[in-house]
Amino acid sequence: MLALIVLCFILFFYIISRRHRGLCYPPGPTPLPIVGNLLSVLWESRKFKCHHLIWQSWSQKYGNLLGLRLGSINVVVVTGIELIREVSNREVFEGRPDGFFYTMRSFGKKLGLVFSDGPTWHRTRRFVLKYLKNFGYNSRFMNVYIGDECEALVQLRLADAGEPILVNQMFHITIVNILWRLVAGKRYDLEDQRLKELCSLVMRLFKLVDMSGGFLNFLPFLRHFVPRLIGFTELQEIHNALHQYLREIIKEHQENLQLGAPKDVIDAFLIDMLESQDDKPTLDDLQVVCLDLLEAGMETVTNTAVFMLLHVVRNEDVQRKLHQEIDDIIGRDRNPLLDDRIRMVYTEAVILETLRISTVASMGIPHMALNDAKLGNYIIPKGTFILLSLYELHHGPHWKDPETFRPERFLTKEGNILQDEWLIPFGIGKRRCIGEGLARSELFMFLTHILQKFHLRIPKNEPLPSTEPIDGLSLSAKQFRIIFEPRKTFKSI
């Protein structure tokens, strides 16, 4: 009798699930009752080490719109420049998923810059951009902020010159300092132990799950039965530690707040909370915005910068050309400036090629359909999570030799930068990453400061570092070491 009841329940769930998907839902592997395609994902993960490769494999079989059912949630994977552009530019697809994994970090609500939508997102984005610009974001002050941190990083590498250095965590505090001067009016020593621990927490967080959200999104009830197995316990511990740190920073600002004289973004937020009558932010808003800036700003740029050094050290001819351009345009007697960027086309091409071949945001940040909507020849139901296959876009046949690191693909015959519309590592449309300008500036300054002063090489008897990424919210490089050798004619700063 019990077996019959269970069977009826499963059948009922399956029928409801099929009805919710609709007859015009994009094709994909057949889902099972309750778990949907999750078991298929687990099976395929034995073959493919990264989730974006699973989606790519299925898309090749089912088409540019891949329809999945993961647990109780519809998920559509979008492949191809035209469909990606359409999803990115249509208002109906501007939503962000409301899965448990995305909201557990923001007090069960859709707050902040990354995972909010609708009026909350528009309000928060407007506030944050206004505050950041007021304190120097995208202004001449960024030359100073980024330059200071690059000089500190160079000095640290000069102190251990000739020694093999694990580079995977090298940029974390540097990146935090650049943004945190605007956000919290604070900078840290590059050897600050507490911030190193917080950076390690963010690294762990980004490796726990891919951008789809995993079992915590699709079968969230499992956290009550096997919390450690599905990563809930570790995620909760990490978020608790990060929120505790942010609460301390905000409390310190509250205690020293001077109305009418904000010193940084947090001060401006707090003053707005006190003085605004309508549509004012809350402490929860502020805390999640700080979390977004800390996590996304740190980990994605760090991973890209590490991949950038990886490709340079693997390709000696690329390193030689970078040294030559730096010597010709900047020389050795002054530090690089952001103003140099417009003339340094080969350096820019190396950055673009890194963003292409090592697309750390392999599926972008998920979108969600705010209403039923037609896409291609199919209907995307309201509430569907939408993943944009950026990694596949950057590794498709358009590039002819996509697995080869070749910066020259971004140079015209005349030696100018070629802007290829197929390269969209920061997304497009209204939900395009607001930190794109800062990220590109940081990558330029990191590369020029380091290559002006050092020749990079792999330690003796160690293999070339692998270009194969580690899966996660942001793809990251496997651990590798570099020796930073001061260039022979380098003059100390």
From Swiss-Prot:
Under the heading SUPFAM superfamilies, the entry gives:
Cytochrome P450
Record's keyword terms, sorted: Heme, Iron, Metal-binding, Monooxygenase, Oxidoreductase, Signal
Q: Which GO terms describe its biological process?
A: juvenile hormone biosynthetic process; metamorphosis; organic acid metabolic process; xenobiotic metabolic process
The annotated consequence of gene deletion is: Larvae undergo precocious metamorphosis in the third (dimolter) or fourth instar (trimolter).
| Required cofactor names | heme
Query: What tissues express this gene product?
Result: constitutively expressed in corpora allata from the first instar larval to adult stages.
GO cellular component labels: cytoplasm; intracellular membrane-bounded organelle
Q: Which Pfam families match?
A: p450
Q: Tell me its EC number(s), please.
A: 1.14.14.128
- Residue span of the signal peptide, if any? 1-24
Q: Name one GO molecular function term.
A: farnesoate epoxidase activity
Superkingdom classification of source: Eukaryota
Q: List the disulfide bonds.
A: none
List the InterPro entries hit by this protein, alphabetically: Cyt_P450, Cyt_P450_CS, Cyt_P450_E_grp-I, Cyt_P450_sf, Cytochrome_P450_fam2
Q: Which reaction does it catalyse?
A: (2E,6E)-farnesoate + reduced [NADPH--hemoprotein reductase] + O2 = juvenile hormone III carboxylate + oxidized [NADPH--hemoprotein reductase] + H2O + H(+)
List of residues binding heme: 433
Which PANTHER family does the entry mention? CYTOCHROME P450 15A1, CYTOCHROME P450 508A4-RELATED
Miscellaneous notes: The enzyme is specifically found in lepidoptera (moths and butterflies) and is specific for farnesoate. Other insects contain the methyl farnesoate epoxidase, which is specific for methyl farnesoate.
Instruction: Please state which protein family the record places this protein in.
Output: Belongs to the cytochrome P450 family.
Q: What is the annotated role of this protein in its UniProt record?
A: Catalyzes the conversion of farnesoate to juvenile hormone III acid in juvenile hormone biosynthesis.
UniProt-recorded name of the protein: Farnesoate epoxidase
**Annotated source species:** Bombyx mori
